[in-house]
């Protein structure tokens, strides 16, 4: 009998996409990933350099100090931005970005509610706070596109 050529089986790497034809939305997903990474990176840095702005929108019902939520969310945004920029971790980055956008939605609702109830907030600030609410869902959708096509 001839010798059999056996290759050791490779365990698939969950961070590396399987080879094969590119997803039809791969180019759009890559561009979207870069845009999301830029937005998340800037927002994450702002959380760390101007935390008081974000402390004020942490829902009061959450236990513990608002600053802890501000710092953790800022670090998470920077980490997710990095994951979105790296091809091997882009799929994970899309998943985490979608989860983050859903997780921060209560803070956006809280900010809009406080802005409406407060007579001190400018009408422009109130309009921005309210306009952000429906815009959160396209962000989730774009992050899921990155996940799906990466």
Identify the function of each model-found stretch.
Residues 1-150:
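Short amphipathic, positively biased membrane-proximal segments
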């Amino acid at each position: 009998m001839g010798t059999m050529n056996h290759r050791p089986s490779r365990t698939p790497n969950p961070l590396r996409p399987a080879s094969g034809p590119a997803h039809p939305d791969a180019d759009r997903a890559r561009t979207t990933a870069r845009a999301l990474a830029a937005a998340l990176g800037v927002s994450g840095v702002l959380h760390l350099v101007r935390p008081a702005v974000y402390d004020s929108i942490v829902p009061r019902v959450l236990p513990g100090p608002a600053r802890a939520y501000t710092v953790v969310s800022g670090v998470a945004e920077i980490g997710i931005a990095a994951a979105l920029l790296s091809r091997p971790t882009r799929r994970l980055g899309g998943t985490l970005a979608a989860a983050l956008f859903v997780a921060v939605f209560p803070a956006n609702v809280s900010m809009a509610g406080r802005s409406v109830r407060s007579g001190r907030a400018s009408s422009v600030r109130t309009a921005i706070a309210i306009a952000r609410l429906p815009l959160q869902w396209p962000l989730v959708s774009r992050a899921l596109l990155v996940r799906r096509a990466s």
